[in-house]
Amino acid sequence: MRVLVNKHVFMQPQPGHYAHTRMSMLLLKPKTKDLLSHRLDDVFRSASREADALAAARYREPERGAPTGFNLAFNTDKNFWEYITNDDPQRGERFARAMHAVNINSLDVIPRLYPFDSLVVDGGLIVDVGGGQGQVAKRILEYFPSSGLRCIVQDRYVVNASSPGPAVVEMQQHDFFEAQPVKGAAAYFFRHIFHDWPDKACAAILKQTARAMDKDRSRILICDQVLQDDVPAEASLLYDIDMMSLFGGKERSLAEWKYLIASAEESLHIVNVIFSTESEAAILDVRIK
């Protein structure tokens, strides 16, 4: 307790007595508690072995499937997602709750970040690739209730997406490293997907998506961070370490995004980048030349 008082987590109004501070009161909120537990148990443990993972990769960007700090810390050859889905679902549930405590993951930001209703002129079909249970897709449909938008949510592990509310999405099992089965959609939407993977893996995902696009009406919408070139925010830099330790991925600057997209498919290019004023999120609008 003395250490925690010194760090202003608790206060000591008199000898032998301790009291809450604004900081300790945050720990009473379940989502904040889950976030702290995730960072201490998942991220810090993984980061403690990241130097070993980098040494094994000879200090080069890891290939898809190369051991990460997470693999070494948890003694598993499964990636983070496979592990929390199959081996430790309680850890996965905690991770999902923790992500709701982080501002960048606020679902309310996404519909305000891009004029999704404008996609109706190109058919109005949004494919949410790697979209989990469809939370984001449903929020978009609820934000534009009379627009005529439709959403297909793809994920490797399909779950029941039913939830209260009028928005209905179609669920489809799909591995985004395989050929994209939905052709010519107005938008292929990727939220927090690419920062989980190294460049070569991301390029493979983009190639499969580009092959399914219609040159005139399709676009790829990437919702991720875009690191500032001068002095990136501290939170963004910490996310960068998180991605490397857990997944072998990374956050990217605009120059790195441009390089990645051009290296994946020559015909793809970024036409616009929209930055959120509410969080670190951004949307990159990618089209075929």
UniProtKB/Swiss-Prot annotation:
<dbReference type="GO" id="GO:0008171">
    <property type="term" value="F:O-methyltransferase activity"/>
</dbReference>
<comment type="similarity">
    <text>Belongs to the class I-like SAM-binding methyltransferase superfamily. Cation-independent O-methyltransferase family.</text>
</comment>
<comment type="function">
    <text>O-methyltransferase; part of the gene cluster that mediates the biosynthesis of the aspoquinolone mycotoxins. The role of asqN within the aspoquinolone pathway has still to be determined. The first step of the pathway is catalyzed by the nonribosomal peptide synthetase asqK that condenses anthranilic acid and O-methyl-L-tyrosine to produce 4'-methoxycyclopeptin. 4'-methoxycyclopeptin is then converted to 4'-methoxydehydrocyclopeptin by the ketoglutarate-dependent dioxygenase asqJ. AsqJ also converts its first product 4'-methoxydehydrocyclopeptin to 4'-methoxycyclopenin.</text>
</comment>
<dbReference type="Pfam" id="PF00891">
    <property type="entry name" value="Methyltransf_2"/>
</dbReference>
<dbReference type="InterPro" id="IPR029063">
    <property type="entry name" value="SAM-dependent_MTases_sf"/>
</dbReference>
<keyword id="KW-0489">Methyltransferase</keyword>
<dbReference type="GO" id="GO:0044550">
    <property type="term" value="P:secondary metabolite biosynthetic process"/>
</dbReference>
<dbReference type="InterPro" id="IPR001077">
    <property type="entry name" value="O_MeTrfase_dom"/>
</dbReference>
<comment type="pathway">
    <text>Secondary metabolite biosynthesis.</text>
</comment>
<comment type="pathway">
    <text>Alkaloid biosynthesis.</text>
</comment>
<dbReference type="InterPro" id="IPR016461">
    <property type="entry name" value="COMT-like"/>
</dbReference>
<feature type="binding site">
    <location>
        <position position="155"/>
    </location>
    <ligand>
        <name>S-adenosyl-L-methionine</name>
    </ligand>
</feature>
<dbReference type="GO" id="GO:0032259">
    <property type="term" value="P:methylation"/>
</dbReference>
<keyword id="KW-0949">S-adenosyl-L-methionine</keyword>
<protein>
    <recommendedName>
        <fullName>O-methyltransferase asqN</fullName>
        <ecNumber>2.1.1.-</ecNumber>
    </recommendedName>
</protein>
<feature type="active site" description="Proton acceptor">
    <location>
        <position position="195"/>
    </location>
</feature>
<keyword id="KW-0808">Transferase</keyword>
